[in-house]
Amino acid sequence: MVKVGVNGFGRIGRLVTRAAILSAKVQVVAINDPFIDLNYMVYMFKYDSTHGHFRGTVKAENGKLVINGNAITIFQERDPSNIKWADAGAEYVVESTGVFTTMEKAGAHLKGGAKRVIISAPSADAPMFVMGVNHEKYDKSLKIVSNASCTTNCLAPLAKVIHDNFGIVEGLMTTVHAITATQKTVDGPSGKLWRDGRGAAQNIIPASTGAAKAVGKVIPELNGKLTGMAFRVPTPNVSVVDLTCRLEKPAKYDDIKRVVKAAADGPLKGILAYTEDQVVSCDFNGDSHSSTFDAGAGIALNDHFVKLVSWYDNEYGYSNRVVDLMVHMASKE
């Protein structure tokens, strides 16, 4: 059983904790968040507007957060180097504040006795791993890793299957992405990215994303062959990737469906899924897959030029991969 500490009890921190409880392979033993006190943690964990009421018990007792009878040590440190992870028995730390995303900043957790740190965001310099794509390249000399982004986790498994079977010459990705916490409820100031400051509930907002370029880091053969952008739309959760790419080998759309289904039923089971149903975004709320290929939504212009569509729960699917990555890392100890 992997003993885990969570730094930052936001959307991902809370859902990694939910996913950990369901997985029974990792145990959250400590949580740090300087902005949320213990009683508020109970409330935030218990009630979730997107994923519903927690189906278990959660209470505050003796200064700890007790979920389903398991007591979790609570810290409220602003400086990650001051968190005494070892005292709480936490060996792996999920860095989910969105703030400490570099090797140097995330490395502060090691000072408190953590053995490994998993950054739940893309990182400028930490090695990135996507389950089902390049997780086998992880080796135990690495103390700090990144689980990449939710969008990279959706795109990379699909890109891998297509590239392995037909070869991707080049491609452009668009993600139609649900609202996230960094956006504004109404128009407000937003640094250099002026569009990002516009009201999230009333606009379709074009935004940048490094998710497609990051695929080149986890699949080196695709480095420089993919880039992409995002449209932020007024939905609370679930996003969809549109990968438009040129294929090296000719392929009928039915050939593409066949290889994706084979991967979803085989080596990528649990990570990539396949559907021919007439689905919409809400149908994937609470889905634990990284990516669900929508066979009915894709189109082909010809045998070399296709548009492929894949859905993802950008909160819960991703949180499950964070747990899976920790389990995989622990298997290499």
Curated annotation (Swiss-Prot):
Its EC number is 1.2.1.12, 2.6.99.-. The record marks H177 as: Activates thiol group during catalysis. It comes from the Eukaryota. InterPro entries: GlycerAld/Erythrose_P_DH, GlycerAld_3-P_DH_AS, GlycerAld_3-P_DH_cat, GlycerAld_3-P_DH_NAD(P)-bd, Glyceraldehyde-3-P_DH_1, NAD(P)-bd_dom_sf. The modification S-nitrosocysteine is found at C150. D-glyceraldehyde 3-phosphate binds at S149, C150, T151, T180, T209, G210, R232. Keywords: Apoptosis, Cytoplasm, Cytoskeleton, Glycolysis, NAD, Nucleus, Oxidoreductase, S-nitrosylation, Transferase. Homotetramer. This is Glyceraldehyde-3-phosphate dehydrogenase. It comes from Columba livia (Rock dove). The gene is GAPDH.
